[in-house]
């Protein structure tokens, strides 16, 4: 039975790592909107040519085009066992459009991490610019504070990892994407047979612990039942 999945969670919740694991574990493609746009442009499909024109003029690709691309992509043979949508939908309008286009979703997994933990994870990252070596103040600290272990040169914090930038990204997510949690939870509760199952799991702990919770979701998932698994 195919398994078509959406993964939700704040930036820094570990979605990328777990998305790679899910795709490999289930042998399904991870479909990211960025990859889809690039592939359509490269393939010079009618949609791709339209996307190229929009991107070259610095415009934003409309939800209508994104849905058409998703619809085209999930018809390809590698999606016969299912697929994982990565970074889509991001808004309620996109979720509604996905549903209206009859693009089937079986399972929505939300990785839940408190905002203060996200801020600590992201603002703690340090990088050695010349080599690309990365550290973390809490999880992987350098031997000498703020110095590269190999050269002793200063480590820097990327602009993206500064606290004000992280807080801004979280605020944007809260406004645009957080409502999707309620959208899918309420849809499931409505008893609509087309509704995907919604599971929320804790994203705290090690990568392996989060992975284990995802495996528990797959064990608990039954298309005939509704199930909200919270740890």
From Swiss-Prot:
Indicate where this protein is primarily found: cytoplasm
Q: What is a GO molecular function of this protein?
A: nucleoside diphosphate kinase activity
Q: In which pathway does it act?
A: Purine metabolism; AMP biosynthesis via salvage pathway; AMP from ADP: step 1/1
Which residues of this UniProt protein bind ATP?
A: 12-17, 125, 134-135, 205
Q: What is its EC number?
A: 2.7.4.3
The biological process GO terms on file are: AMP salvage; nucleoside diphosphate metabolic process; nucleoside monophosphate metabolic process
**Gene3D superfamilies recorded:** P-loop containing nucleotide triphosphate hydrolases
**SUPFAM superfamilies associated with the record:** P-loop containing nucleoside triphosphate hydrolases
User: Which keywords appear in this protein's UniProt record, sorted alphabetically?
Assistant: ATP-binding, Cytoplasm, Kinase, Nucleotide biosynthesis, Nucleotide-binding, Transferase
**What S-S linkages are listed for this chain?**
none
Which PROSITE patterns does this entry report, sorted A to Z?
ADENYLATE_KINASE
Q: Which reaction does it catalyse?
A: AMP + ATP = 2 ADP
Family membership noted in the UniProt record: Belongs to the adenylate kinase family.
Designated name of the protein: Adenylate kinase
Q: Which organism is it from?
A: Coxiella burnetii (strain RSA 493 / Nine Mile phase I)
> What would be the name of the gene that encodes this protein?
adk
């Amino acid at each position: 039975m195919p398994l078509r999945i959406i993964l939700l969670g704040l930036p820094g919740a570990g979605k990328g790592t777990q998305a790679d694991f899910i795709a490999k574990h289930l042998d399904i493609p991870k479909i990211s909107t960025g990859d889809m746009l690039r592939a359509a442009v490269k393939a010079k499909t009618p949609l791709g040519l339209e996307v190229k024109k929009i991107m070259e003029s610095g415009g934003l690709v409309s939800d209508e085009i994104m849905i058409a691309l998703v619809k085209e992509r999930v018809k390809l043979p590698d999606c016969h066992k299912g697929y994982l949508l990565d970074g889509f939908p991001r808004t309620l309008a996109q979720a509604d459009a996905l549903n209206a286009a009859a693009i089937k979703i079986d399972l929505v997994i939300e990785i839940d991490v408190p905002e203060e933990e996200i801020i600590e994870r992201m603002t703690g990252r340090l990088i050695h610019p010349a080599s690309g070596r990365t550290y973390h103040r809490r999880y992987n600290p350098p031997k000498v504070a703020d110095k590269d272990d190999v050269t002793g040169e200063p480590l820097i914090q990327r602009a993206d990892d500064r606290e004000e930038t992280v807080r801004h990204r979280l605020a944007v997510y809260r406004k645009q994407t957080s409502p999707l949690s309620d959208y899918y939870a309420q849809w499931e509760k409505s008893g609509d047979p087309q509704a995907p199952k919604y599971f929320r799991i804790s994203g705290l702990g090690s990568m392996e612990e989060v992975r284990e919770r995802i495996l528990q979701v797959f064990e608990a998932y039954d298309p005939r039942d509704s199930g909200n698994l919270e740890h």
